[in-house]
Structure formats: C-alpha cells, structure tokens
Amino acid sequence: MEELLHISFVNDGRDIPSELDEEEDAEIVVASDISDNDLKLQFWTNALPVIVDAFGGNSTYSNVSPAPRSTLDGFVGISGVNLYCTMRLRKHTLSANIWIDVKDKEKNKRLFDVMYARKDNIEKHVPYNIGWNRGDDKRSSTVNVEIEDVDFNDTSRWPELTQFLATTCVALKAELITACEDELRVVIDGN
C-alpha cells in the first residue's frame, strides 16, 4: 500500500509559494462531522424561529417542532392543502412547497387551477422560478420554489437560506392560499 505524506505549511514568516498563496477569506469546504439527521435537526432548529416570526408568531409554523426530517410541515387551515419546506441533502436543494391532495383527483386539479390563476400575483412577490405541477397523470398537484447548489454544511449561509424559506412560505400562503381561501373552500365543499 502506498504511504501518504502529509505536508503542512505553517505561516512562520517565510514566503509561501505563489501556487499555494493564501486568500484572505479562503473558504475551505470540509465534509461534515455530524450525521445527516443531526444536520437536519440543527438546520430546522435554526430556521424555525425565523419562519415563525415571518408569519407573525402564532400562525402557520407556531406549533411545529424541529425534527431530524427532510421536511417541515406548516398548518394552513385547509384540509388537503399543505405548505411545507424541504431540504434535500443529497440533491443539495432547499424548497418551499404547496402540496394539494384532498383525496379527489378532480378537486385537486380544480384547486390547483384556482392557485394557478394567481400566477402573475405570486411571481411579483417571489424572485425565484416557481414550479407549477398540475400532475394530470397523478392525484396530487404541487407548487414549489426551489434553490439549488445548497451546501447545508456551510452554516454561514443558513441566515440566507432561512430567510428564503420564511419569505417564500409567507408569499405562497398569502398569495395562493389566503387570497383565494373562499374559492378553495368552495371547490373542496363541492359547491
């Protein structure tokens, strides 16, 4: 087996070769020393208070506790319409989502259409691409806003990431759920 040689350069006043020059704010990316579940728990523990505050306290995420899961579900008051956040460690993505499933495919599509009619309004409030998935071949429908290339081990980015979730979830709820709540309830109730 080949023997590995470890070389360490100590800044002792000698010139550092130009090819090894240090950058003042060089960022070193290292593998996380914690488990995926611990990382998820730490991220949600950090993010949840910011999300709760964005909703004004006693609201959508106020009764939610951090957990070592990939998703964090909020309560919007309409059965079958769900607002949730997702962190995917392996895919390096973070998203705010609406999932529609009232156990009736036709109603789900009508609920999606009510929200989709507000597409122009939500796009004014969310500066990211919005994924509209009516899912005609499935029972459920989704709306999601996702950012990619997220390194969850880089805790210096957590404030930016939690702010993304907070502002995006508030906008999704305000523009696609609260603003059309009466229409959504009419579809669900079958009137």
Regions found by a protein language model. Name each.
Residues 1-2, 15, 138-140, 151-152:
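A short acidic, often aromatic-flanked loop/helix-cap motif at beta-alpha or helix-coil junctions
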Residues 1-28, 32:
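Acidic metal-coordinating catalytic centers involved in nucleic-acid phosphodiester chemistry
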Residues 10, 31-32, 53, 189-191:
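Compositionally biased, intrinsically disordered low-complexity segments
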Residues 114-126, 149-190:
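Ampiphathic alpha-helical segments that act as solvent-exposed interaction surfaces
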Residues 28-148:
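Polyanion-binding interface signature
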Residues 3, 93-107, 162-179:
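Hydrophobic transmembrane alpha-helix bundles
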